Regions:
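Conserved Rossmann-fold cofactor-binding substructure of NAD(P)-dependent oxidoreductases
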Residues: 43-61
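Helix N-cap/beta-alpha junction loops of NAD(P)-dependent oxidoreductase domains
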Residues: 71-74, 118
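Rossmann-fold scaffold of SDR-type NAD(P)-dependent oxidoreductases
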Residues: 6, 61-68, 108-111
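Residue(s) in the substrate-gating loop at a strand-loop-helix junction
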Residues: 114
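N-terminal Rossmann NAD(P)H-binding glycine-rich loop of SDR-like oxidoreductase domains
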Residues: 6-23
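A short, exposed helix-loop element centered on a Lys and neighboring polar residues
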Residues: 88-89
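Conserved glycine-rich Rossmann-like NAD(P)H-binding loop of the short-chain dehydrogenase/reductase
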Residues: 23-37
Length: 118
């Protein structure tokens, strides 16, 4: 299964990356920061979830895990809410308006939140 994880360089995101790799999945990580993860089934991309025009088009994930977020920032709504919406709209759905439907490959979308990112 191909899993897309946003916030892949942070604590929860990095743990998710490792867990999915340990379970044999192909993982794509989005983050503004680099990662120390080196694995044949891992692809790390420096991506800002607030900027959907920067998203690569060739991913077709079956699972999306939205972990990316910032704390105590003027951008918290843009990153924590809009970023999650941007990624989910781009990879979990096809079509526009009333014709929107789930992407054929998508099986699950997981949105992670914490008290610090409220």
């Amino acid at each position: 299964m191909r899993v897309l994880i946003t916030g892949a360089s942070g604590g929860i995101g990095a743990a998710c990356v490792q867990r999915f790799l340990d379970e044999g999945h192909e993982v794509v990580g989005f983050d503004l920061l680099p990662t120390a993860v080196e694995h044949e089934r891992y692809r790390h991309l420096i991506v800002d979830v607030r900027e959907p025009n920067s998203f690569p088009g060739d991913l077709e994930p079956q699972v999306i895990v939205n972990v990316a977020g910032v704390q105590d920032s003027a951008d918290d709504i843009a990153a924590n809410l809009r970023g999650t919406i941007n990624v989910t709209e781009r990879y979990a759905f096809v079509g526009e308006g009333l014709a929107t439907k789930p992407a054929p490959a998508i099986q699950s979308v997981v949105n992670v939140g914490s008290a610090s990112g409220h």
